[in-house]
């Protein structure tokens, strides 16, 4: 499963339209890191805000109501040089905390992804507020293993997004 995910990530490097996948590409994506057919691929642990949440395929609303979504078209969360995994979560839901406290993180804070027995630890190195359609900070950077967490800002409404990038 990890090898197939790494091959998928390598193919993303040459796919300029990766954030708008075709139906076939989306079906392939959803089949990877999907051991139990629920779409759950692992979980994220953020000690600083006492957060441990399941990570699921896609950023569809049904996913974001219950957990953290993996942005299709971004690298799958298996690490490696030339990867950039992007994870999204809601803030301000009455039914769940999710990424409500994400704005409390600062540069140097650590979070960990647990995926198929792998443990990937990242350190926040950049915090930015961006417009909803701005994918500039989500690009893959040669030689880097990156993960960005993002959520809506200000609290409870989506005017823009807070991006926390980590390496």
Regions found by a protein language model. Name each.
Residues 1-41:
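Extracytoplasmic entry segments of secretory-pathway proteins
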Residues 23-40, 66-74, 88-102, 134-136, ...:
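N-terminal post-signal-peptidase region of extra-cytosolic proteins
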Residues 35-38, 47, 77-80, 105, ...:
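Extracellular/periplasmic catalytic domains that process cell-envelope and extracellular macromolecules
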Residues 50, 91, 128-131, 153-156:
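A generic structural motif
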Residues 51-122:
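Mid-length scaffold segments of soluble, non-membrane domains
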Residues 123-135:
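Short, compositionally biased
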Residues 162-167:
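Conserved small/polar residues in nucleotide/adenosyl-binding loops
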């Amino acid at each position: 499963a990890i090898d197939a995910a790494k091959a998928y990530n390598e193919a993303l490097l040459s796919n300029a339209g990766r954030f708008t996948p075709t139906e076939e590409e989306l079906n392939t994506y959803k089949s990877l890191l999907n051991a139990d057919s629920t779409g759950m691929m692992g979980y994220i642990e953020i000690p600083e805000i006492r957060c441990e949440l399941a990570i699921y395929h896609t950023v569809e609303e049904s996913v974001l109501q219950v957990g953290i979504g993996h942005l299709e078209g971004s690298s799958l969360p298996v690490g490696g040089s030339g990867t950039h995994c992007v994870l999204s979560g809601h803030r301000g839901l009455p039914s769940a905390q999710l990424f409500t406290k994400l704005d409390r993180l600062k540069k140097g804070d650590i979070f960990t992804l647990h995926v198929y027995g792998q443990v990937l630890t990242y350190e926040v190195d950049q915090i930015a507020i961006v417009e909803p359609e701005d994918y500039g900070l989500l690009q893959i950077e040669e030689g880097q293993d990156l993960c960005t967490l993002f959520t809506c800002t200000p609290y409870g409404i989506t005017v823009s997004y807070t991006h926390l990038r980590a390496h």
